[in-house]
Amino acid sequence: LLVWLAGVAILTLRLLAGWLFVQRLRARGTAPAPLAWQQIAARLSKRLHIARPIRLLESAMVEVPTVIGWLRPVVLMPASALSGMGPLQLEAILAHELAHIRRHDYLVNLLQTLVETLLFYHPAVWWLSGRIRVERENCCDDLAVSLCGDPYTSAKALADLEELRADSNRLVLAATGGSLIHRVRRLIGTPSHAG
């Protein structure tokens, strides 16, 4: 019981630290995204039947697009993405992030983290949790493709985003088989090789 309590306490502290970090991301180094992109976000939100207002912010603090919040969601877009990606790719990325909001993934992820915290000792929980995270991204990729109409645009958007994020580590991603490469292969219908 003491070991379980210690594990829960450590993971709860980790969860709280993560929450504080996310709140800091929302508040610091952000500015409203250009009006044209806010209008595109509003149009995509309407197509996804999202009734809540969504704030679209440009952030110098994030390297990848991020959704924060459930009741008052905020999409943080990296400044490099807004200035360095083509409009079709950027729209595909934005559609993916809005799909997370449509699916209430922020809340689902919090509940998932709670289960991980309480059942941290069980390997099946961590395996299943990893699978859920992969499938959550796949579902959002599929929704983005259904909105934007072209899996190749979404795949190129992911590749462009990774290039902007980590130009010097591009080969590392390909060599390690990171989840991004699996998502790109899945979108364009190229089978992934296991092992």
Where do the model's predicted regions map?
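Membrane-embedded and juxtamembrane structural elements of multi-pass membrane proteins
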Residues: 1-195
